[in-house]
Amino acid sequence: MELPFGGSKGALIIDPNAWNKKELEKITRRFTSELAKRNLIHPSQNVPAPDMGTDENVMAWISDEYRRLNPTEIDALACVTGKPISMGGVYGRIEATGRGVFYAIKEFLKYSKDYKRIGFTCELSDKRIVIQGFGNVGYHAASLLAEHGAKIITVIEKNGSVVDENGIDIEKLKKYFNRKKTFEGYDGFTKTRNRFLTKDCDILIPAATESVIHKGNAKNIKAKLIVEAGNGPVTAEADRILIRKGVIIIPDFYANAGGVVVSYFEWVKNLSKMRYGLMQEREEEKKQSQLVDALELMTGNNFPKHLRTEVVKGSTEIDLVRSGLEEKMREGYKKIHEKYHSDKKIKDFRTAAMVIAVKKIADAYKYLGI
């Protein structure tokens, strides 16, 4: 993804639902303290980001505890990402991974060499999609895909699933889920869960835990395209089975990279101490307004009011973050596509992406003389 933002993985083995908010805060602050003791959290060393079981509150506690331990650190806000806006977060971080998944699918459907391999058209509107997971990633991916015409026919969660062959109303389901904390009682609810991974559909998006597609169910997968929105949802054995079946898999380290891309944007914002758009928003508005005035003068017609507001508006932080994310997802997909089609030895997108990554590391070692 061409981000100077490498890092590591770490976790606390607890169930957040088993602890109240005060207890979670205490646990998080102690965890931050232990990381700091080992020099494992620092704006220039290791910058944690949100993952399963965390939210803006958790990231805010980490940030505040780090600043308490390092009161003179000028870049302290950049020690962690996924923070609330009021604590140095960036607009668009919550939706970032799900939006990145949406952009990945959009890119796939731009390349006829890719989508024609599995009998797809370039249209999103005729695609039937099954999504496993309805957290930040699953919800935002589902919402954007539905907004652009795709049919979300099944959403799978840990307590059951919702099925509607005509397409689920994602926003209505989200409101219900937020209120009830379960799908139970919603139209189309069933207690069946992972069996729906093998449901007849065009696109399958596993957006939850690891290894949900394995050698035991891979042969029954009917989706032609799998987009790995979660980390490691397809085991190595399942991967081989699916490739032999002709299924295309868009790998996790590209498909779900939207989160780390926007975390990088947040980190840069914190280091620069300025929000995105601050230096250009009003200048853009002025220039666009002058352009609209010139068009009205030249044509003798008034620009429609509802269009004028949209055209004249300068780029806000959320506009720039979404634009930057889309560009990074475009760049990433293009590289994978080109590598896959340029080397007959490469049989799948995952291998193509790995070859690109390993070559970058090899080149770095070569030029550094290591």
Go through the PLM ranges and name each one.
Residues M1-Y91, E95, F102-A104, R275, ...:
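N-terminal ligand-binding/catalytic initiation module
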